[in-house]
Amino acid sequence: MIGRLQGKLIEKQPPEILLDVQGIGYELLLPMTSFYNLPDTGQECTVFTHLVVREDAHLLFGFSTKTDRTLFRELIKTNGVGPKLALAILSAMSVHEFAYAIEREELSKLVKIPGVGKKTAERLLVELKGKFKGLRQPDFFVESKHITVPDIVSAEKETPNDEAVAALVALGYKPPEAAKMVKKVANGDLTSEQLIREALKAAL
């Protein structure tokens, strides 16, 4: 199994990236919480990975930290939570935010995530509550330091708003809802990544 990749970042199109590792291009899907930590295209980066094998495709998911990957693996063990929904959850909340929502049984926060209904949220509470007690330990689930989101070059024909809407749709939001979310936080000076971050923050 591929557990880690290090190479040159060739393309960034939220939530996907293309990573060149010794001449081989790997397509990876990243939660937005990891996407925000990526360097500019053309630079070296390292991602921790998890491979999902399906009948119709092999999907490679990438994460900026092992902690993010650990939570992803815990999520997909939960009944009714597949990789796509796990990606949406990790895009909407950081590991700490999700852990606290679970430990405090904040059902109202969980159901705001696209694809998470009341039953799924309740199942997450039942199956994951108590698994985050290590948060009190300094060497477990340590929050990554704040990283400024780098500016990125927009695609030739797509505006940052278009890219942000497309990314939100890929994360499970319906197109009209995604467009409304982006419009609400739109600012001419924001990159697509910043728009996505603000839209997800406002949704919660």
Curated annotation (Swiss-Prot):
Organism whose genome encodes this protein: Actinobacillus succinogenes (strain ATCC 55618 / DSM 22257 / CCUG 43843 / 130Z)
Alphabetically list the UniProt keywords: Cytoplasm, DNA damage, DNA recombination, DNA repair, DNA-binding
Q: Where does the record say this protein resides?
A: Cytoplasm
Q: What is its main location?
A: cytoplasm
UniProt note: domains: Has three domains with a flexible linker between the domains II and III and assumes an 'L' shape. Domain III is highly mobile and contacts RuvB.
Note down the stretches annotated as region Domain I. 1-64
Q: Which cysteines are joined by disulfide bonds?
A: none
Pfam families cross-referenced by the UniProt entry: HHH_5, RuvA_C, RuvA_N
What is the residue range of the signal peptide feature? none
Q: Which Gene3D superfamilies match?
A: 5' to 3' exonuclease, C-terminal subdomain, DNA helicase RuvA subunit, C-terminal domain, Nucleic acid-binding proteins
Residue ranges, annotated region (Domain II): 65-143
What SMART domains has UniProt attached to this entry? HhH1 (SM00278)
Matches recorded under InterPro entries: DNA_helicase_Holl-junc_RuvA_I (IPR013849), Hlx-hairpin-Hlx_DNA-bd_motif (IPR003583), NA-bd_OB-fold (IPR012340), RuvA (IPR000085), RuvA_2-like (IPR010994), RuvA_C (IPR011114), RuvA_C_sf (IPR036267)
What are its GO biological-process terms? DNA recombination; DNA repair
Q: Where is this region: Domain III?
A: 156-204
**Any idea which GO molecular function terms this record carries?**
ATP binding; four-way junction DNA binding; four-way junction helicase activity
Report the GO terms under cellular component: cytoplasm; Holliday junction helicase complex; Holliday junction resolvase complex
Write out the ranges of the annotated region (Flexible linker): 144-155
Q: Belongs to which family?
A: Belongs to the RuvA family.
Name the gene behind this protein. Answer: ruvA
The protein depicted here goes by the name: Holliday junction branch migration complex subunit RuvA
Its job? The RuvA-RuvB-RuvC complex processes Holliday junction (HJ) DNA during genetic recombination and DNA repair, while the RuvA-RuvB complex plays an important role in the rescue of blocked DNA replication forks via replication fork reversal (RFR). RuvA specifically binds to HJ cruciform DNA, conferring on it an open structure. The RuvB hexamer acts as an ATP-dependent pump, pulling dsDNA into and through the RuvAB complex. HJ branch migration allows RuvC to scan DNA until it finds its consensus sequence, where it cleaves and resolves the cruciform DNA.
What quaternary structure, including any partners, is listed in this protein's UniProt entry? Homotetramer. Forms an RuvA(8)-RuvB(12)-Holliday junction (HJ) complex. HJ DNA is sandwiched between 2 RuvA tetramers; dsDNA enters through RuvA and exits via RuvB. An RuvB hexamer assembles on each DNA strand where it exits the tetramer. Each RuvB hexamer is contacted by two RuvA subunits (via domain III) on 2 adjacent RuvB subunits; this complex drives branch migration. In the full resolvosome a probable DNA-RuvA(4)-RuvB(12)-RuvC(2) complex forms which resolves the HJ.
